């Protein structure tokens, strides 16, 4: 009997037959997708994220405002001077209450705005340079035309004389001593023209601008000076940022400057300089006599006799910076030793005889960085936060520099803010020129009629009541004065602080009585209730404090005092 084969099961792995229906069925099977449950965000977390975003955008907007103000400042200084200073001051006052919110706040980059501002500034600088070139070309053309007209006039005058002689038939040499003579007038004009040309030649420090431009590639600074001192418990290099450029000027340029400052000194001694341009003090003190000439914006000045005078013109009157020294500043800017936006607006010429020395100088707050000193003679200068000296003015400090003739010292950073510098005595005569920039808001008179007058100048003739000023870059530069031990005391220069805008404080009754940290957010209410801190004692939590001790018997009856009274029997 034949046994029929049973049909193979679909699960039999030994089956050799191919069943496409099975494959199709296997492919058609779908796997369900599991959807994760929706994340629920709390309302408080959403508000915190939104406030964080607002703060970041707020900080970015503040950075954009800073970039725009810097752009306007650079643009206006290159064109027409300070016109937006009042606007900048108003913006700064308006943003004072932003500081607690924006302190250490991170924000997205504003590099795109900064790059566009740089492009605009570069284009404006190029246009301004092209405009100056065109103006110089027009001036040169006018000078050429004027010279040709003068020559034509001279030829016409000579022709008229010859014609008159030919008509009369007599040729005679006539000496005309009349002051209205054409020949005399033309000769005097020629002399004046030659004098003007000579004066113009003396107004430029160099003979060839091409040579000066090529010299910029050869100028290499000497830097990396070290003078370690203790500042608030930390070892700090107090001369960081000091750069020295040796033999910056040539011998003929130094000779021209020496002759020029000698003429200025003679004019100052004879009283021919305006106002307080020439200053002579300590005349009877041997070795410490000082002669100096200040030009441009004043840094020293006398105290006026009438302090209560309402005369608005009662200001320090000095000579402007002469063209020759302006040419020196132009070369420093061209050689990129001083940035254009920090161009000096004042300078002081110091004269030292044999054995004379200066008092240590520390940058006052109303002077900007950098400060540059050009020495026209071989000199020795000492640097340091603390300087020691003997009775003959031999100063010793952490750093002593022997400077060659024509060297330039550029002081930035710690070397300008922390370190004092002094000119040491020497056996030869010395001349130095210090270039500086005074902040515009310190020498513009914005004071009220009844407020004390402040010109932003350093007063050397009468002490004033010292007022606390903020430390520069977070350090305290006050030093105990111990002259008997040989440690140098600070220079006896009374410094007028920069004008401070008045701050309006609310009444004590309006301010909240609760405790606080002093940082108030804009959306916080002043009179909001506050829970007591748990770690305070129960008496303080219930606001029951101990009564104050009674006042001393020496105080008047019915009166109170905020300070304890000590009675000595």
From Swiss-Prot:
Chain coiled-coil ranges: 118-151
Compositional bias segments (type: Basic residues): 531-545
Any GO BP annotation: vegetative to reproductive phase transition of meristem
Swiss-Prot/TrEMBL cofactor(s): Fe(2+)
Acidic residues: compositionally biased ranges: 167-179
Compositionally biased intervals (Polar residues): 180-189
Enzymatic reactions: an N(6)-methyladenosine in mRNA + 2-oxoglutarate + O2 = an adenosine in mRNA + formaldehyde + succinate + CO2
Keyword flag Coiled coil: yes
Residues reported in the UniProt entry to bind Fe cation: 366, 368, 421
This protein's record includes keyword Zinc-finger: no
Keywords: Coiled coil, Dioxygenase, Iron, Metal-binding, Oxidoreductase
Renumbered residue ranges of the record's region Disordered: 164-190, 531-569
Recorded phenotype for the gene knockout or disruption: Reduced vegetative growth and late flowering.
Low complexity: compositionally biased ranges: 551-560
GO molecular function: demethylase activity; metal ion binding; mRNA binding; mRNA N6-methyladenosine dioxygenase activity
Binding annotation for 2-oxoglutarate: 430
Enzyme nomenclature, EC number: 1.14.11.53
Recorded superkingdom: Eukaryota
UniProt cofactor note: Binds 1 Fe(2+) ion per subunit.
Family the UniProt entry places it in: Belongs to the alkB family.
Task performed by this protein: Dioxygenase that demethylates RNA by oxidative demethylation: specifically demethylates N(6)-methyladenosine (m6A) RNA, the most prevalent internal modification of messenger RNA (mRNA) in higher eukaryotes. ALKBH10B-mediated mRNA m6A demethylation stabilizes the mRNA of the key flowering time regulators FT, SPL3 and SPL9, which are involved in the control of floral transition.
Designated name of the protein: RNA demethylase ALKBH10B
Source species: Arabidopsis thaliana (Mouse-ear cress)
Upper taxonomic lineage: Eukaryota, Viridiplantae, Streptophyta, Embryophyta, Tracheophyta
